[in-house]
Amino acid sequence: MTVTLSAYGGDPRETGRRAALRAPGRGCHLVTDAPTVKAAPDKGVATYFCQHTSASLTINENCDPDVRVDLEGALNKIVPESWHHEGFFEHVDEGPDDMAAHVKTTLIGSSIRVPVTRGRPCMGTWQGLYLNEHR
């Protein structure tokens, strides 16, 4: 899955920068240090947008790798794939993980805005940008 990230600075005449980021597979992936995230403007606001209907972006704790596992597990409890087999969803043609992934994306969101200084996202010490691939 490839995510398109757009980053815009403080100048409204700027067209912005776009870059692609490849998700390694299902799960919550810390992408703060990915070259595409670093394609942000020198200052202003970076808007990261995921052009995919079963993936989301969020900011969360970046120190303990268990956070990624726990986030994935919690999302699977909140929106279980078993709903596919229980008749909860009408949209079922693309497999048991498809509609659950769409719901997770809707709950978390497909874009995020982050202030930028010196070309780096301004986040707290323990914050990182996550790409969540839900299927």
Label each residue range with its predicted role:
Residues 1-135:
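Active-site histidine-anchored catalytic micro-motif
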